[in-house]
Amino acid sequence: MSRQTPSLSFEVFPPNPAVGNDNIISALQDMRELTPHFISVTASNNKFNIKETTVRLTDFIQNDLAIPTIAHLPAIYLTKEKVAETLADLDKVAETIADLDKVGVQKILALRGDIIPDVEPQKDFRYATDLIEFIKEQAPHFEIVGACYPEGHPDSPNQISDIQNLKKKVDAGCSSLVTQLFFDNERFYDFQDKCTLAGIDVPIHAGIMPILNRNQALRLLKTCENIHLPRKFKAILDKYEHDPESLRAAGLAYAVDQIVDLVTQDVAGVHLYTMNNAETAKYIHQATHALFNHQSLG
């Protein structure tokens, strides 16, 4: 029995409103030429107005660029009223798209969101499952995507508990999953096997982030302490720590190797964390495009 060809998709983030949109608009126009299956747009917890950042950028990608889009919605600092308002804003985008007949169902990546030190969370959405259930009740026409963590959520006591919580997300209404970035494919495959044993049978898209410079690597090591770094990856960071050009080349090559291996092992999709860098997306696309089918998810 033949398997469906995997998808290649991108993640971008809205720029700080004080910086302006020129750079992200230019990057997205370049990314459009790569025909991604979809683009996801992140949202910041309690930092910028979601309507003025995530919703606006989602609107541009779907209406102006005609690319299927997933809007991130972290809810730990939102009330039910604010989430309902955001869903209504996204509905307006969906209505416009329906008129233009460009893309299909509006999708949301439902997240709890990161805890901000010294900022008190709201009480309506303690977990992503709470948000998923609320969306299904209030706006069931939205397709919901969930986040998952091949090496365990930082707040989970162990992977068994983490996968049990993930099963609750899927049962609540997630139709697919996107992983946190990882550098060890074997850990991803082990995670997939455990998900299958737990009865999680939705597509899992593998999150891949090419490491392009030393500062990016240092930030990653600080913020993603749960991620295992294979010996081969550590060797790249050590050998080219003071050679930016070689580090970028080796980081891109490592990501390409990961993707080729994932596709060979029948991954459902690869979700590329672009950091708004169109050149990164172009390089990955050029090296791997023959492996992917460029039909949008809908």
Label each PLM-derived region with a short phrase.
Residues 75-99, 122-126:
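Glycine-rich anion/phosphate-binding loops
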Residues 11, 39, 100, 169, ...:
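Conserved, mostly hydrophobic/aromatic
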Residues 19, 123-149, 155, 197-257, ...:
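Active-site pocket-lining/capping segments in soluble small-molecule metabolic enzymes
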Residues 35-57, 113-125, 174-188, 194, ...:
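Glycine-rich, proline-tolerant flexible connector loops at the mouths of alpha/beta enzymes
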Residues 12-15, 42-46, 72-78, 113-115, ...:
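Active-site beta-loop-alpha junctions enriched in small/polar residues
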Residues 7-23, 69-82, 88, 145-161, ...:
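Active-site mouth loops of central-metabolism enzymes
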Residues 1-41:
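Conserved N-terminal beta1-alpha1 strand-loop-helix module at the mouth
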